[in-house]
């Protein structure tokens, strides 16, 4: 019976829902509450605290289709991806879980029913394994389910290994929950090489594990003894790719519908015809992990999860390059992936444009260095080959140079080397890497962090949410990392109290400042930091003395605290506004909240435009004007997520969390100090925006009076610039006039050749273009001086307007008056004018009539001279 991957997923979830299981959404690929994990790599990750008894949920049965990534860290399948039938960087794990509810009998019965009745797999193609001493599981399979004994294989401990070190015994660590497993295998047939589990040929591809059921039955003690758990649990996992291959009648995972669609799409965008090429498999796998990592907030970078993403992208691009890809191609597969993932691709569809953009930019950036790096790598490999030595090995220094200088991940270099049958000097590479780390450590060693050096057992109770004053006693004091019994004036120290209203730096909010007072002295608190479960007050003994055990009054600088709280609340509004405007890919990557402003780092690929920044300000200030009451509620983490609260990636949260809400605009998990209402913020103003790393932008902003100061400073700058511009304009006008005067003088000289004689009098009649009336007057005066005695008429056309200037030397005004002359011409061109007998001007609008009007001047003068 053929089933698509999407149909398999839905059938699994519906089956277990019918068995009383709660369908739980796939958790993020970035584990929120487990700092030990780079990526979510198993279905049980999100339920870890449930299995440990640290968290209780509203259900005791759950089922999921969990997205997983294995690339980087302990679980790294990257170098095998594309070269085997079942290795992937991204996969989906179908799972059903029991938290102290049902156990082995039901788990085994559920698995068998789903496989043989829902999926209708032939029972004779299935065989199972149990832990060697797990007679209970063996009997359930044999006597209750009916699997023949010869198809149930007992698997013991590995030879030479520790007790319980077996493929069929699961353990979280050296101590803690553990228990036996039972695995279900599918027989792909005699035509495929491979032996049954437990035989020397078990690594063949004939018998493939499809479902693992882990029975958390014991709690292993430090001495190795196994104590039965009061409430045993079940954790199961079935890879959707493997079971889909069976349901679609194929052997390799890369032959199922999801991968075939991606392989065909990749071949099409690259222009490559051989669909069996392994590079197409690599690309098809990598687009899945890259796309969903970006959906879950990971951005390409040079560290941590971002660097793993960058490595996967670059590996895919390099394989596309091998196949002859021209230009960016990888991002073009996102739409195909979103469609073929069916119901599991809805979030990818919503963020498709963002994912495509991230991949395209990263691919284009890498494309500029790929060619150069490949040239260096191939040259190095060619040099080694030419030496003809046995055992071709690429030295670690070259691998490091490619990584450090050209951004070539070591595994990409390893891929290329392996294709050319070279080995990598991994030891030499690690040595070069360690030398670089040491240089970085030495460069960053600026002083002693006494806070990190101090160990203290005290647990400080924080009482600062409701006030800025309190009383307590001194639990411990430290000077330069050493515990002391007393302090004197001038001592720089760290004080730990039993209870304090001082907020310790956390979540980007800086620590409080203020005073710790006694009758005998004052300690000025300059900063407050966390110290394990204690709160450390850093500062100086301003006056008097202080001793361990003294009763003290604690006084936070309330004005400073208030300013910090306003900026912290504004940070939440800024985060929400950025996500609303730029997209849900925007996630907080860091922040700093101080009394005089805030700094917010977030994931985004491009500079935020001036128009976008203006809109962000508008959105934030609109929420400030609405004066939302800032509500704080304490609830369990699951309830917080259902409420839509944003959690910060990498942050570890307690079972109970503080949820901060500002109307329906912003809901976040936050333990910081905030304003009472958004209106208290007053005003929000962005002062700068810029990039701090690949894909990470930074906004700095101020609020309240600081925002007013920033606006006034900006206005003052504008006024200053306007004054400067006005002054420059005046200077330019003067320069322009000087140039015009020079041009007029030059023009006067040029037109002197047009002077004619009428009845013994020198006459100049000329039409010009582009001059202004002031220049014409200057020209007339210059010409009068040059001719000594004469009559001048100059006409000028400028912007479809006519300017006329007439000049007559004083010895001729008894015969010809300038006003009469200019009036006569003006009347012919639709204008009028007049002036003194020796100088007159007029205007007109009929440009077409000007040539004919000019022709009438000479006859008119001949009659009068």
Curated annotation (Swiss-Prot):
A single GO BP: negative regulation of DNA-templated transcription
Binding annotation for Zn(2+): 568, 572, 670, 674
Superkingdom classification of source: Bacteria
Cofactor details (free text): Binds 1 zinc ion per subunit.
GO cellular component, one term: cytosol
One GO MF term: aminoacyl-tRNA deacylase activity
Alphabetical UniProt keywords: Aminoacyl-tRNA synthetase, ATP-binding, Cytoplasm, Ligase, Metal-binding, Nucleotide-binding, Protein biosynthesis, RNA-binding, tRNA-binding, Zinc
Entries under InterPro entries matching the protein: aa-tRNA-synth_II/BPL/LPL, Ala-tRNA-lgiase_IIc, Ala-tRNA-ligase_IIc_anticod-bd, Ala-tRNA-synth_IIc_core, Ala-tRNA-synth_IIc_N, Ala-tRNA_ligase, Ala_tRNA_ligase_euk/bac, DHHA1_dom
UniProt enzyme class: ligase
Catalysed reactions, as listed in the record: tRNA(Ala) + L-alanine + ATP = L-alanyl-tRNA(Ala) + AMP + diphosphate
This protein's record includes keyword Electron transport: no
Keyword match Zinc: yes
Compartments (UniProt record): Cytoplasm
PROSITE patterns: AA_TRNA_LIGASE_II_ALA
Cofactor: Zn(2+)
Annotated EC: 6.1.1.7
Free-text function comment from the UniProt entry: Catalyzes the attachment of alanine to tRNA(Ala) in a two-step reaction: alanine is first activated by ATP to form Ala-AMP and then transferred to the acceptor end of tRNA(Ala). Also edits incorrectly charged Ser-tRNA(Ala) and Gly-tRNA(Ala) via its editing domain.
Domain notes: Consists of three domains; the N-terminal catalytic domain, the editing domain and the C-terminal C-Ala domain. The editing domain removes incorrectly charged amino acids, while the C-Ala domain, along with tRNA(Ala), serves as a bridge to cooperatively bring together the editing and aminoacylation centers thus stimulating deacylation of misacylated tRNAs.
Recorded family membership: Belongs to the class-II aminoacyl-tRNA synthetase family.
Name this polypeptide is given: Alanine--tRNA ligase
Organism, scientific name: Vibrio campbellii (strain ATCC BAA-1116)
Encoding gene (name): alaS
């Amino acid at each position: 019976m053929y089933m698509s991957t999407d149909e398999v997923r839905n059938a699994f979830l519906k089956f277990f829902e019918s068995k009383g299981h709660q369908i739980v959404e796939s958790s993020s690929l970035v584990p929120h509450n487990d700092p030990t994990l780079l990526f979510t790599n198993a279905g049980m990750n999100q339920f870890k605290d449930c299995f440990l008894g640290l968290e209780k949920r509203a259900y005791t049965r759950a089922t999921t289709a969990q997205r997983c990534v294995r690339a980087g860290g302990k679980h790294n399948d990257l170098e095998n991806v594309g070269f085997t039938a079942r290795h992937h960087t991204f996969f989906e794990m179908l799972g059903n879980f029991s938290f102290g509810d049902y156990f082995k009998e039901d788990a085994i019965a559920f698995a068998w029913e789903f496989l043989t009745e829902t999926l209708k797999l032939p029972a004779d193609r299935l065989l199972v394994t149990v832990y060697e001493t797990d007679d209970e599981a063996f009997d359930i399979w044999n006597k209750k389910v009916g699997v023949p004994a010869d198809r149930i294989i007992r698997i013991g401990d590995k030879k030479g290994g520790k007790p319980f070190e077996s493929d069929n015994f699961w353990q979280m660590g050296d101590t803690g929950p553990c228990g036996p497993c039972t695995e279900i295998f599918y027989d792909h047939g005699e035509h495929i090489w491979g032996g049954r589990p437990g035989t020397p040929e078990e690594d063949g591809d004939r018998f493939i594990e499809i479902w693992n059921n882990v029975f958390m039955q014991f709690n292993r003690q430090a001495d190795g003894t196994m104590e039965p758990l009061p409430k045993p649990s079940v954790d199961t996992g079935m890879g959707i790719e493997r079971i889909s291959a069976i349901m679609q009648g194929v052997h390799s995972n890369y032959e199922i519908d999801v991968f075939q669609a991606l392989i065909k799409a990749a071949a099409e965008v690259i222009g490559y015809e051989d669909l069996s090429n392994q590079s197409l498999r690599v690309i098809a796998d990598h687009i899945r992990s890259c796309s969903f990592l970006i959906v879950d907030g990971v951005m390409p970078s040079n560290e941590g999860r971002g660097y793993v993403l960058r490595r996967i992208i670059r590996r895919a691009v390099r394989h596309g390059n091998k196949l002859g890809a021209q230009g960016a191609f990888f991002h073009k597969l996102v739409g195909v992936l979103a469609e073929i993932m069916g119901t599991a691709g809805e979030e990818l569809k919503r963020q498709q444009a963002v994912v495509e953009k991230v991949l395209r930019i990263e691919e284009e950036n890498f494309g500029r260095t790929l060619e150069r790096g490949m040239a260096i790598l191939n040259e190095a490999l060619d040099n080694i080959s030419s030496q003809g030595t046995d055992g071709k090995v690429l030295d670690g220094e070259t691998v490091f140079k490619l990584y450090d200088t050209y951004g070539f991940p070591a595994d990409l270099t390893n891929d290329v080397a392996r294709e050319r049958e070279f080995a990598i000097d991994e030891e030499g590479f690690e040595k070069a890497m360690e030398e670089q780390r040491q240089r970085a450590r030495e460069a960053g060693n600026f002083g002693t962090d006494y806070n990190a050096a101090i160990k203290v057992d005290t647990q400080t109770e924080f009482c600062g949410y409701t006030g800025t004053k309190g009383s307590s006693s001194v639990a411990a004091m430290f000077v330069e990392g050493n515990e002391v019994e007393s302090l004197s004036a001038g001592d720089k120290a760290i004080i730990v109290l039993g209870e304090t209203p001082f907020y310790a730096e956390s979540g980007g909010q800086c620590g409080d400042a203020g005073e710790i007072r006694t009758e005998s002295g004052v300690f000025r608190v300059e900063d407050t930091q966390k110290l394990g479960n204690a709160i450390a007050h850093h500062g100086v003994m301003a006056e008097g003395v202080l001793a361990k055990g003294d009763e003290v009054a604690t006084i936070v600088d309330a004005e400073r605290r208030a300013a910090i709280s306003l900026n912290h609340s504004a940070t939440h509004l800024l985060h929400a506004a950025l996500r609303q405007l730029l997209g849900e890919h925007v996630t907080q990557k860091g922040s700093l909240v101080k009394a005089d402003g805030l700094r917010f780092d977030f994931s985004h690929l491009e500079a935020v435009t001036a128009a976008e920044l203006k809109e962000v300000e508008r959105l934030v200030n609109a929420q400030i004007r609405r004066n939302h009451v800032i509500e704080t509620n304490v609830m369990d983490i699951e309830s917080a997520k259902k409420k839509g609260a944003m959690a910060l990636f990498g942050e570890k949260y307690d079972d109970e969390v503080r949820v901060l809400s500002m109307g329906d605009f912003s809901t976040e998990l936050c333990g910081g100090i905030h304003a009472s209402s958004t209106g208290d913020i007053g005003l929000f103003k962005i002062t700068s925006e810029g990039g701090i790393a690949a894909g990470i932008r930074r906004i700095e902003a101020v609020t309240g009076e600081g925002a007013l100061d920033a606006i006034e400073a900006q206005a003052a700058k504008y006024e200053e610039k306007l004054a400067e511009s006005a002054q420059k304009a005046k200077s330019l006008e003067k320069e322009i006039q000087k140039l015009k005067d020079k041009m007029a003088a030059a023009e006067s000289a040029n037109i002197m050749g047009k002077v004619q004689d009428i009845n013994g009098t020198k006459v100049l009649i000329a039409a010009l273009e582009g001059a202004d009336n002031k220049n014409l007057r200057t020209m007339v005066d210059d010409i009068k001086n040059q001719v000594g005695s004469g009559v001048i008429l100059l006409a000028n056309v400028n912007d479809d307007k006519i300017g006329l200037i007439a000049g007559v030397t004083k010895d001729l005004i008894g015969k010809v008056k300038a006003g009469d002359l200019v009036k006569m011409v003006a009347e012919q061109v639709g204008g009028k004018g007049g002036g003194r007998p020796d100088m007159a001007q007029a205007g007109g609008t009929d440009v077409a009539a000007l040539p004919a009007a000019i022709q009438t001047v000479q006859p008119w003068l001949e009659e009068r001279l």
